[in-house]
From Swiss-Prot:
CDD domains for this protein: MEV_P-protein-C_like
Gene3D superfamilies: 1.20.5.110, DNA helicase RuvA subunit, C-terminal domain (1.10.8.10)
Phylogenetic placement of the source organism: Viruses, Riboviria, Orthornavirae, Negarnaviricota, Haploviricotina
Keywords: Calcium, Metal-binding, Phosphoprotein, Viral RNA replication
GO molecular function, one term: metal ion binding
Pfam families in the cross-refs: Paramyx_P_V_C, Paramyxo_P_V_N
Name this protein carries in UniProt: Phosphoprotein
Biased composition (Polar residues): 286-301
Amino acid sequence: MAEEQARHVKNGLECIRALKAEPIGSLAIEEAMAAWSEISDNPGQERATCREEKAGSSGLSKPCLSAIGSTEGGAPRIRGQGPGESDDDAETLGIPPRNLQASSTGLQCHYVYDHSGEAVKGIQDADSIMVQSGLDGDSTLSGGDNESENSDVDIGEPDTEGYAITDRGSAPISMGFRASDVETAEGGEIHELLRLQSRGNNFPKLGKTLNVPPPPDPGRASTSGTPIKKGTDARLASFGTEIASSLTGGATQCARKSPSEPSGPGAPAGNVPECVSNAALIQEWTPESGTTISPRSQNNEEGGDHYDDELFSDVQDIKTALAKIHEDNQKIISKLESLLLLKGEVESIKKQINRQNISISTLEGHLSSIMIAIPGLGKDPNDPTADVEINPDLKPIIGRDSGRALAEVLKKPVASRQLQGMTNGRTSSRGQLLKEFQLKPIGKKMSSAVGFVPDTGPASRSVIRSIIKSSRLEEDRKRYLMTLLDDIKGANDLAKFHQMLMKIIMK
């Protein structure tokens, strides 16, 4: 119905444009109104007369007769919805007879039909369309009950003559209005207006035209598979359409067991098929149609639970796949948790490294302040009376002044030193070191780090044995030298043996 109403709106707009482009003469309007009056008197010939009038009117398209308005003072007449129009009800709407000649538009109505084709009165349809007609650009369309609440125009606004045109709010409408913004006039009001218009030639300017579509075909409504749109109002319900089922599939229900015992002999029931829970669609085969039973139907005849088993197996496969996905997700989550733990350990390692770097920096700072004294050897040639030679200054490893550690090792106090003689990191102070800091002279006949001097002690013999064992001589020669070492007596013989051994090893 929405598509049909939209088509009516489109045709009405085309009529309006045609009327504006080529106004209709008064003679053509009178002829059309006369034909319309005959249609209203004989409703059975309504459609045939409409076709003749539409074919005879000049410069108009097919739906133009539904929206013809007088532009030259003519008196239009409007089709009624069946016989029974009264000529005595001009005062029911509060419209004087003298104002009936001011009408320049026609009024037509929409009826709402149910699915059986019967007209329903007083039901508002959000998709009913009120089309604009006439040449006047200020003509308006009145909204429905819901939309009159949001209208900017006061309800019951009087016209120029001081009479109320309608009891509903009205608002201007443009060419691109929505179908849901238009109301359906009440059936009683439409009948009253049609009676008044069919009688008098003068009619107040209503400012709207209602298009009356033909009643729907009940047979078409019953066979249509598409539900009819009943609007967007929450108070309305869509009942849809009913379609007779043409399918032959289904399962035959089991018959109840009769409690009474049969009086006669029983019939054999060995070939009776068992009951099934469901059955596939059985298509009747005819030579003309050429249809055959599908292989799936034949397979279903072999076992009633085939589809159930297949569906159960599919469900089991889906459950197995979901369980596998869940297991994989759990593995991924566990790995992510381990990664988070490793991240925490890495952060703790970084903190420990930072602490160690701080400690190393602290140790470097302490080492930079340490002074190491390096004493000299031998006697001072300028002081022959001195027992030992002392280092003229204490040289630090890391750059410091040379006189910093002298106060701790010299006999003289720090205040008695001559500081003016300190130049280029050296001092002229000649004070003696304390006894515990003085070095003893090295004896040439005693073993030291400078060289090994053998004696008659067991330590000297152990050193010579170690020299023989660590040498790269043959094993026989090593055993022979060990035997000679055991036989040597005296310090001189041992010193000669040591010299001979060193010559053999150095070869």
